[in-house]
Amino acid sequence: MKWPIGYVALDSVMEGWAPERAIGVLADLGFQAIDWSFVQFDRLDQSPTAFRDLVSRTRDAGLQVPQLVMADDLITLDAHLWTQRVNHLIRAVDAAAEAGVPSVGVSTGPHGWDRTALQVGIDISETQAWDLAVAGLTQVVEHADSSGVRIGLESVWGSLARSGERTQRMLDSVPDLGITFDPSHFVLTGDDIPQWAHVWKDRIVHVHLKDGFGVQDSEDFFFPLLGEGRVPWQQLLTTLADDGYDGYASIEAESYALLSQCFDNDPTEPARLSLQLANRLYALAGV
């Protein structure tokens, strides 16, 4: 099964492009989908109709939109801010439902790249952090259940649900929560990536094609081109195929040193190369 390949429009350059430019470039390269994000749709200032129009323009160019990507940090001691962030996610669900987008991507927080984020165990207790994340995601998932939109938790590095075991704990706490399966983050925690994909076969709503190398607690981890990291691609792809995954797989490009040093911060050629590598990995895995 060859899953349609999309592109997460959230790299350091393309996120600053006008959507029409991203649509044109990705369509010309041969991508089949785009994951739009909170960058292209501001759920504070825009109505769900604005996102529906963006999705319509995307589909007019022959591309689908499998996911709306959000990144609201649910780990905060500010009760007003926490409520605001949960409501942001609920508005994103409403926008996805109106546009016919099947999933919304979320993470728990705290975000490791944000120096202002709380540090669990220092600024906030582990118990408090889990209670906030579970309560917030429960509200969002319950709201989404009535709309047909699935919520896909991404196990982002540094976040509360950053490893296989911690993600499973969150899934146990929020039974209808799905997974946006990004294998790169499980490289950093040393998890058995194909095994977790199999365990979550009924919870995976979307897949990211992204490689990783290094250890989470080190400053030296990075996300290289597909095939250059430690993701066991053949095992992972055959596991997904054998377990019947039938959604989209979106490339998430974060090879920022390569982008800067070799391509003058133009993501077009790295995107083209990533698409070629993804198709090669598909072929080698026989999917």
Regions found by a protein language model. Give the residues of each.
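N-terminal small/glycine-rich loop or linker at the start of catalytic domains
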Residues: 1-10, 66-76, 112-120
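N-terminal substrate-binding region of glycoside hydrolase catalytic domains
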Residues: 25, 29-46, 69-72
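Residue-level detector of anion-binding/catalytic polar loops
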Residues: 32-33, 64, 102, 150, ...
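Conserved beta-strand positions in the central sheet of alpha/beta enzyme cores
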Residues: 35, 67-69, 105, 152, ...
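Glycine-rich, proline-tolerant flexible connector loops at the mouths of alpha/beta enzymes
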Residues: 35-58, 108-115
